[in-house]
Every structure is written in structure tokens, then in C-alpha cells.
């Protein structure tokens, strides 16, 4: 199933690149809603541009696709664009605090956030603290937790992820080739 969705993303992106400016509708037959939505999401993701640091931003008359899943696709696209922006932002601009603040701002008021840093981090999470020994004072490591304010169901769901920012200065625990492949 994952592989099929992956191909649908790419088909949507290829269709977007193939179509010149204008408005398009795709007529489906025998398809399921999820397949259509993934194709439309692929179409939308093809329009992503990282222009955060550009003084002059390119105007692009991107082709548009009309479909019945606009709200859901727009929400998913917004998440993909946010993550891509984080990935493309250089480490000298986006450190641990900046990742935390960006995530908190993106999630708005629907989550409670807790941040552990400094001596408390060293006490509770000594290995995270140890890895960051070579970091500058402005880019010290931290541990954060984001919890949904309002429980939506009785089932508990736990998602564990990590946001890692790095530069190749400080303590070098990897080989040169290993450092080059980090991003």
C-alpha cells in the first residue's frame, strides 16, 4: 500500500510538471478516494519552492487542479511544506530552540509544550546533553515534549520523533565522509 501511494505522489508531481499554466480536471473511473487524494497531493507537492532567503522570489503561474479533496490536500500539503522548510533551512539559522519554536508556532494552541534544557537536561537526559558538548552557547541541545491539549478519543496514541539540527563543527565523532552524508 505504501509503495502504491508513493507512486501516486510521483504521478501527480509528473502530471503537474507536464501541464503548463492553466486549470485542469482529471476524470477518474474505477478509482478509490485515497488514490485520488494521493495523486492530488503529489500534484500540489510539485509546486513546493524553498525561497525563504531569496530576495527576489520567482513568480510562477503553476497549473491548478480542481478536485473534491481540496481541504484535506491543503492541510497535508501545509505539513509537507513546513517539514521541507525545516529540512532546507541551514543549521546556523535553525538550531534546537528554533526547531522547538517553529513546531510550537506551527501547531498553534492545540498542544501544550514542555522544554528541558541546561542543567535539568544534563540530569534527566545525560546522553543528549553529552552529544551537545561541542555546540555553541546559542545552539545547546534540548528535549521537548508536545502534548495534545484535548483528548479526541479514548485510545492512546504515542508518536515519537526527533528533530535534529547540526553543523559539522564542535565535537567530531564521525569520519569526514560520514559528516558529508548527514543531510
Summary of predicted features, one role per range:
Residues 103, 157, 173-183:
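Alpha-helical metal-binding/catalytic segments enriched in His/Glu/Asp
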Amino acid at each position: 500500500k505504501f509503495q502504491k501511494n508513493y507512486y501516486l505522489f510521483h504521478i501527480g508531481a509528473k502530471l503537474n510538471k507536464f501541464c503548463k499554466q492553466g486549470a485542469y480536471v482529471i476524470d477518474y473511473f474505477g478509482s478509490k478516494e485515497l488514490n485520488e487524494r494521493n495523486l492530488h497531493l503529489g500534484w500540489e507537492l510539485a509546486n513546493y519552492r524553498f525561497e525563504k532567503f531569496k530576495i527576489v522570489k520567482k513568480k510562477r503561474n503553476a497549473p491548478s487542479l480542481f478536485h473534491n479533496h481540496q481541504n484535506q490536500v491543503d492541510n497535508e500539503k501545509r505539513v509537507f511544506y513546513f517539514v521541507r522548510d525545516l529540512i532546507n533551512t541551514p543549521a546556523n539559522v535553525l538550531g534546537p530552540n528554533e526547531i522547538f519554536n517553529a513546531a510550537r508556532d506551527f501547531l498553534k494552541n492545540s498542544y501544550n509544550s514542555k522544554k528541558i534544557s541546561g542543567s535539568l537536561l544534563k540530569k534527566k537526559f545525560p546522553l543528549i546533553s553529552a552529544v551537545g558538548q561541542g555546540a555553541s552557547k546559542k545552539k545547546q541541545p534540548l528535549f521537548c515534549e508536545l502534548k495534545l491539549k484535548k483528548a479526541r478519543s479514548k485510545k492512546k496514541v504515542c508518536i515519537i520523533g526527533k528533530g535534529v539540527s547540526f553543523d559539522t563543527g564542535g565535537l567530531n565523532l564521525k569520519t569526514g565522509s560520514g559528516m558529508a552524508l548527514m543531510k
